[in-house]
Amino acid sequence: MDDNKRPLYLPFAGPAILEAPLINKGSAFSEEERIFFNLEGLVPYAIETIEEQASRAYDQFRSFNNDLDKHIYLRNIQDTNETLFYRLVQNNISEMMPIIYTPTVGLACERFSKNYRRNRGLFISYPNKDRIDDILNNSTRQKVKIIVVTDGERILGLGDQGIGGMGIPIGKLSLYTSCGGISPAYTLPITLDVGTDNPQLLEDPMYMGWRHPRIGGEEYAEFIEAFMQAVHVRWPDTLIQFEDFAQKNAMPILERYKDRYCCFNDDIQGTAAVAVGCLLAACKAAGTELNQQRIAFLGAGSAGCGIAEAIVAQMVSEGISDEQARTQVCMVDRWGLLLDNMPNLLPFQQKLAQKCANIQNWNNFSDNISLLDVVNNAKPTVLIGVSGVPGLFTEEIIRAMHSHCARPIIFPMSNPTSRVEATPKDILHWTSGQALVATGSPFEPVVVDGETYEIAQCNNSFIFPGIGLGVLASGARHVSDAMLMASSRALAECSPLAIDGTGPLLPKLEDIHAVSKHIAFAVGKVAVEQGLTLPMSDEILQQSIEGNFWKPEYRRYKRTSF
């Protein structure tokens, strides 16, 4: 029987019900419920449906003049009535996703302490490091199955936001529910408050976090270890998603824990998975294979290198050697093209640095080999931007790329919109509409020579909700590389571009539920094949996916004694 058809038995009544966001129905409580739960007179007389409530809420949403106010309004609904919040978002997903997540969430993080209204999630501060178990036990969520955790050091492209980074876990988990059908009762946002190196926050009298420079080294590592162990004891089967950790910590944390616990890093692995899915769809539209592409990256941090490694793995799966695949990938950062003779490269960068011997025949390049030098010599067919610096994909670079590639694949993926390497409008005009474009933030359709081009948002929300649903439905103990690769292929299979040559690389957000279920099945199937969960048939896996897919509908309540 569908959970939404079963009555929910509650041992309390009166105002306490109206103060519980997971339970509150507001004006939708039936006459019987109002009597049994002592709610008569506490809500207006009229009994409304959830759609009537959502219609009123949407009118109120539209009355706000700026996106931050809209964000705050939606968060207030979420903190009052989560079922209504998710029905409202589900009904208006394309309009509201940029409000509850990127790009608006960046401003919400910057103003988190100033706009703080009500608690949500857990703040685990370093001075309380010996009481992490107690803090986890304080959570109002008892059956946590997915945690999104950040330390606030690298929030989007905005840098260190301290505890203001909590906006990211809250936003991500909102997408797990609205896109992936994960019950909000199973989600928990957590911020690890290890101080901040942002002087504006340290000097801000309203800042609500621990006023102390960030800890590092052994202190930081021991704190993370204590947190991971405590979570595993409290909720041994939960999926932990790492979010917006600084480059120096993100990869080491992932490497340390990915084989010990069920966890993944969305900035590294989720971004990589959605980028590869986009690339596979673009290659199919261009009539070629990924292993035939030459790829240039602008940005060689953990996210960029994570994408590059995922691309290499996919190329290898298509039949070329690992060594050959790496010669086809050029990583450019602020110091130019990464070369194997460069000092101070991070371990994950060293594996992607080009051998100096590979560029001996290049012409007219500077001491620090620029992106334009790479475009003119390596002649890439794919250009991916994860630099966080706006405007670096110049007209000269894009036109140079188009001169040797009829249908260049160009992904300016930096967030938020203000930090994008080039706008889709410019890219499509510079390439006469021939570029295959996907971006990290939402953009309006572009018209070139009378043709309208929909712009795909290469957003992790197309991937991580499906991964989470697949892990929950299958009971996977770990998130393997093969599961992530399966998610990319499943996403590519959903691309509308195969049907419409001017369509977007990725599906519409209105189709996100079907996409997430498709990805969840692919992820869960690989988990079963790899022995990361109990054996189950495809039919049972599909049933589990449907059974775990929560819908924003009110349940009937019955009263029970304590």
Swiss-Prot record:
The keyword Phosphoprotein is assigned to this record: no
Database matches in SMART domains: malic, Malic_M
Subunit structure: Homotetramer.
Family stated for the protein in its record: Belongs to the malic enzymes family.
Residues the record marks as site: Important for activity: D267
Residues the entry annotates as binding NAD(+): R154, D267, N415
Single annotated GO MF: metal ion binding
Organism the protein comes from: Shewanella sp. (strain W3-18-1)
InterPro entries: Aminoacid_DH-like_N_sf (IPR046346), Malic_enzyme_CS (IPR015884), Malic_N_dom (IPR012301), Malic_N_dom_sf (IPR037062), Malic_NAD-bd (IPR012302), Malic_OxRdtase (IPR001891), NAD(P)-bd_dom_sf (IPR036291), NAD_malic_enz_proteobac (IPR023667)
Full protein name: NAD-dependent malic enzyme
Keyword terms of this UniProt record: Metal-binding, NAD, Oxidoreductase
PROSITE patterns assigned: MALIC_ENZYMES
Residues noted as binding a divalent metal cation in the record, renumbered to the chain: E243, D244, D267
Active site, UniProt feature: Y101 (proton donor), K172 (proton acceptor)
Cofactor binding summary note: Divalent metal cations. Prefers magnesium or manganese.
Magnesium among keywords: no
E.C. numbers: 1.1.1.38
GO cellular component assignments: cytosol
Catalytic activity: (S)-malate + NAD(+) = pyruvate + CO2 + NADH; oxaloacetate + H(+) = pyruvate + CO2
Biological processes annotated in GO: malate metabolic process
Cofactors named for this entry: Mg(2+); Mn(2+)
Gene label: maeA
